[in-house]
Each structure stands twice: as C-alpha cells, then as structure tokens.
C-alpha cells in the first residue's frame, strides 16, 4: 500500500542518516521528550486505575460488581470525547489548546469527585468520573496526531525524516509507563498492609486502595497538564 511504501521510505531515510545521528537529533527534540513524558505519565495513571479498580470496588465500596460500572465510566467518556475533539480542534485551530483545557478542567472536576468518593456517594462519584473523563478524553485520541505534528516539525527544522523513531515514543511510553503503573499497584498495596487472604482489610490498606484508584490518578492528571501546555509546535 502507499502507506507502507511511505513508511518504508521514512525508515530508509533514517538509516541513510545513521542511527547515532538520528538518535542525537531525537534526544535534543524537546517535543519528542515532552510527548514521551506524557505517554509515560499517562500510562502510569492508566495502569494504576486498571490495577486498583477491583480492589477499590471490593474493599472500599464493598461491591466487586461495581468494577463494570467503573470501567464504563472510563470508556464511554473517551468515545464521546473522540467524537467532539475534531470539531473543537477545527474551531479553536489548536490541538494543544483543546488538550490543555480539557485536562485542566478535568483536574478541577477531580476535586468534587474525590469529595463524593470520601462521602461514599456512589451516584455523584460516578457522575463526576464520567464528566471528568469526557474532558480528559480528547488527549487519548490525539496523542498519535501529536506525534505526527512533532515528526513534521522535526523534518522542517532539521531536514531529517525520522518518522519511525518519532513514533517509538508511543511504544516506549506504553511499556515504561504501563510497567511502572502495574508494578506500583503491587508495591503500594503491600506498603499499605493489604493482605490478599483477608476478607476484611486494615484501615491503612483501605486508604492505600483509595489513593491508588482515586487520589494518585488525580495528582498525576494535574502533572500531565504541564507537558501538554508546552506541546504547541513552533517552527
């Protein structure tokens, strides 16, 4: 296909310039580093909530079957965001603005979400989780487009085609961030005193479960807004 031919051409171009030269340009490309940071932090957050979800539903809310509702409140908002994101980006003329303000508003909405979680008001907690997810969801669907923009910027400013290596930040970010997030769930549960064989968990274990699923992702979401705010590409 033409897409495969284009990709092959890009890879050949990268080989022509040499791995060392291309890698040197890459590590000095601030946009590549920022997108890589976004990927790593995003997937740390994602895997924290994925790994801790069943524990939060079972031990904090007292009903393991709630995990299905939690999953839907995270999946459907992203679908809605993906439907509206192109319209918003076209209207504002900036992917960076849409992503930044989406995550900024999402972070603010995390405050009432945490409050209702502490009050164990499930309906309001789920409502704010859903709304929060809609605003944060624009970034999920535009990360690859962001890489494409950064790749184009690199070609314009350096004259070197390095699309293949630019896209490596996605796989690297997923593996590193996902690995850290998954491992952190186990480490922090153990640190909090969680006992897998116990039917009733200690107060410290419950608190850690709450933090893993709700508080830590909230804090990480705020952190993500920092690199997102600097992803407006300038030649």
Predicted regions, residues:
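C-terminal ends and interior cores of transmembrane alpha-helices
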Residues: 106-118
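Helix-to-loop junctions at the C-terminal end of transmembrane segments
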Residues: 82-94
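Conserved small/polar residues in nucleotide/adenosyl-binding loops
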Residues: 231-235
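Juxtamembrane intracellular "pre-TM" segments in multi-pass secondary transporters
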Residues: 7-34
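Pair of pore-lining "gating" transmembrane helices in MFS-fold secondary transporters
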Residues: 32-48
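Short amphipathic helix-loop junctions that connect adjacent transmembrane helices
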Residues: 51-65
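Helix-loop junctions at membrane interfaces in 12-TM secondary transporters
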Residues: 115-128
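A membrane-interface helix-boundary motif in multi-pass transporters
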Residues: 190-218
């Amino acid at each position: 296909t033409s897409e495969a031919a284009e990709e092959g051409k890009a890879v050949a171009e990268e080989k022509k310039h040499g791995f060392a030269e291309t890698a040197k340009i890459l590590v000095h490309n601030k946009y590549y580093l920022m997108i890589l940071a976004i990927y790593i932090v995003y997937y740390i957050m994602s895997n924290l909530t994925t790994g801790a979800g069943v524990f939060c539903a079972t031990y904090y809310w007292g009903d393991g079957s709630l995990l299905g509702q939690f999953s839907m409140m995270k999946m459907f908002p992203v679908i809605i965001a993906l439907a509206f994101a192109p319209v918003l980006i076209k209207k504002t003329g900036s992917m960076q603005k849409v992503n930044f303000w989406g995550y900024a508003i999402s972070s603010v909405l995390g405050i009432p979400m945490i409050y209702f979680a502490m009050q164990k008001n499930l309906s309001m907690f789920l409502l704010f989780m859903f709304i929060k997810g809609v605003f944060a969801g624009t970034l999920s669907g535009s990360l690859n487009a962001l890489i494409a923009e950064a790749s184009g910027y690199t070609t314009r400013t350096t004259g070197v085609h390095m699309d293949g290596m630019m896209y490596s930040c996605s796989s690297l970010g997923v593996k590193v961030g996902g690995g850290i997030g998954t491992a952190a769930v186990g480490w922090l549960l153990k640190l909090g005193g969680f006992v897998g064989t116990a039917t009733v968990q200690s107060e410290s274990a419950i608190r850690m479960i709450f933090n893993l699923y709700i508080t830590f992702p909230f804090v990480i979401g705020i952190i993500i807004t920092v690199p997102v705010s600097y992803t407006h590409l300038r030649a």
